[in-house]
Amino acid sequence: MIDALMANILWLVFIIIGGVLISWSVHFVPVGGAPAAMAQATGIGTGTVQLAAGAGLTGLVSAGFMMNVTDNLPLILASGAVGAMIMISVTMIVGTWVYVYGVGCVPSSAKVKYDPITKYRQDLYVSQGTEGHGLPTVSFVSGVIGGLLGGIGGALVYYSLIEVGLTAGLSTGTSSGVTGHELVGIAAMFAIGIFFVNAVIPSYNIGGTIEGFHDPKWKKWPKAVISSFVATILCAIVAVIAISQLGGI
């Protein structure tokens, strides 16, 4: 057991880094929850975990497809990042269409007087009794950054788990040689599990809604990152030991 951990110490570290990136990324995603679904809060009208998982798991799938072509880590991470960024961007764009053309409200933030990016006035367009609505430019940019970090984190976790399996002798050759192998399934299950753990922890930190990096709640991210660091260590140890032991079957 100790030998398995020491033999995969590099991948163990990469899994932990990936988990921390996932946790940090959640704080960038504009989450509006139920109030946003009724256009009474800025952000996307669903929960933290759903948005983070949707973007991050898309990045994980993108990384998996890239591993069919190459085992180059930077390219795999880039693929994961782009996949997650596209996913969250499309979600925010479609949400904005609904808010603007369906509900008929102007995307605006109640957390700041001026949009930090466009410098447009915000408070004049916030409807009375609401905490903003829609997705102003700063929230959109923040969400894309969140997708970038989450995609890289998810891809890094998945790639590392695949390499742990290869080290254990579950397959030979490069990562592209594991397509269709049982290793893909077991690595994906552990990667998804680690992703959800690190998506849930920031939810307690955020406590409902967050507009992006301009929201005062964003400054709480160090607490969630530290908690996710500890949680990911435990998850990584279990995952590495479990996958390593499969090499003897």
Curated annotation (Swiss-Prot):
State the Gene Ontology BP annotations: methanogenesis, from carbon dioxide; methylation; one-carbon metabolic process
Instruction: Fetch the InterPro entries from UniProt.
Output: MeTrfase_D
- Give EC number(s), comma-separated: 7.2.1.4
Q: In what pathway does it function?
A: One-carbon metabolism; methanogenesis from CO(2); methyl-coenzyme M from 5,10-methylene-5,6,7,8-tetrahydromethanopterin: step 2/2
> What are the UniProt keywords, alphabetically?
Cell membrane, Membrane, Methanogenesis, Methyltransferase, One-carbon metabolism, Transferase, Translocase, Transmembrane, Transmembrane helix
**Membrane topology designation:** Multi-pass membrane protein
Gene Ontology molecular function, alphabetical: tetrahydromethanopterin S-methyltransferase activity
- Extract one GO cellular component term from the record: cytoplasm
Entry keyword annotation includes Transmembrane helix: yes
Q: Where in the cell is it found?
A: Cell membrane
Q: Which reaction does it catalyse?
A: 5-methyl-5,6,7,8-tetrahydromethanopterin + coenzyme M + 2 Na(+)(in) = 5,6,7,8-tetrahydromethanopterin + methyl-coenzyme M + 2 Na(+)(out)
Q: Does the keyword Translocase apply?
A: yes
Pfam families xref list: MtrD
Membrane spanning segments where?
A: 9-29, 47-67, 75-95, 138-158, 183-203, 224-244
Question: HAMAP family, per this entry?
Answer: MtrD (MF_01097)
Question: What family does this belong to?
Answer: Belongs to the MtrD family.
Briefly state the protein's biological role.
Answer: Part of a complex that catalyzes the formation of methyl-coenzyme M and tetrahydromethanopterin from coenzyme M and methyl-tetrahydromethanopterin. This is an energy-conserving, sodium-ion translocating step.
Oligomeric state and interaction partners are given as: The complex is composed of 8 subunits; MtrA, MtrB, MtrC, MtrD, MtrE, MtrF, MtrG and MtrH.
NCBIfam families recorded: mtrD
The protein depicted here goes by the name Tetrahydromethanopterin S-methyltransferase subunit D
Q: Which organism is it from?
A: Methanosarcina acetivorans (strain ATCC 35395 / DSM 2834 / JCM 12185 / C2A)
Quote the gene name from the UniProt entry: mtrD
